[in-house]
UniProtKB/Swiss-Prot annotation:
Annotated organism of origin: Mus musculus
In-chain residues carrying the UniProt-annotated modification Phosphoserine: 112, 182, 184, 189, 193
InterPro entries registered for this protein in UniProt: Ashwin (IPR024887)
Family named by the database record: Belongs to the ashwin family.
Record region (Disordered): 163-232
Biased composition (Basic and acidic residues): 206-224
Protein name: Ashwin
């Protein structure tokens, strides 16, 4: 059963919500199916049938409640139920929204951002490590530069060079002393030691003057200075 309401087609369910559009026979049939007693006076008048239908047969919550105690109690429950549904709907919408909406207004662009600068903060961090000292400057030179040699190589080579110079001086002095003390005649070689005997090595003690001279000739040992690298 379908009809037209306001120039548009309506389904049967929509017609049940508008009893004024229903026929008198349909209203009586609906009330009888609901087991609602209808008096003879009410059967004759369609307006009375419509009121009875709205009171007992129309789908909830469009149904009109009676003006008694039970009707007032049901009306309060209906209002409470509607308020609860509204709160549930609003909470569901808020739950779906991950974060609150940001409303942009032009006033936020007028704020200025201030950056606090320290006296030595960023400048010290941007300084290269080569400015720490001259030794570190030489150390951080690339290996391709042939003009300067890293101080580590110089420090490692110094003791070896001093030892070789000292040994050369000792051999030269020993040679001069032997020529001075040896006679003009031929030098006799010592007899060969027999087999099985171990040769005895004699050490000649150098005089005090020569020892002092060698000590003066020996350059002072250069101590390797430990450079502590401090990171900014």
């Amino acid at each position: 059963m379908a009809g037209d309401v306001g120039g548009r087609s309506c389904t049967d369910a929509e017609l049940l919500l508008h009893p004024e559009l229903l026929s008198q026979e349909f209203l009586l049939l609906t009330l009888e199916q609901k087991n609602i007693a209808v008096e003879n006076e009410v059967r004759v008048n369609k307006d009375n049938l419509t009121d009875l239908y709205v009171q007992h047969a129309i789908p909830l919550p469009q149904r009109d409640l009676p003006k008694n105690r039970w009707g007032k109690m049901m009306e309060k429950k209906r209002e409470h139920h509607e308020v609860k549904n509204d709160t549930k709907r609003s909470s569901a919408v808020d739950g779906l929204r991950k974060r609150p909406l940001i409303v942009f207004d032009g006033s936020s662009t007028s704020t200025s951002i201030k950056v606090k600068r320290t006296e030595n903060g960023a400048d010290d961090r941007l300084k290269p490590l080569a400015q720490i000292g001259s030794t570190s400057d030489a150390f951080w030179k690339s290996p391709n530069s042939s003009s300067r040699i890293s101080p580590l190589v110089l420090f490692s080579n110094l003791p070896v060079n001093h030892k070789m110079e000292h040994n050369n001086n000792d051999t030269q002095q020993n040679h001069d002393l032997m020529n001075r003390k040896s006679p003009s005649g031929p030098v006799k070689s010592p007899p060969l030691s027999p087999v099985g005997t171990t040769p005895v090595k004699l050490k000649r003690a150098a005089p005090k003057e020569e020892a002092e001279a060698t000590n003066h000739l020996k350059p002072p040992e250069v101590k390797r200075k430990i450079q502590h690298v401090t990171w900014p």
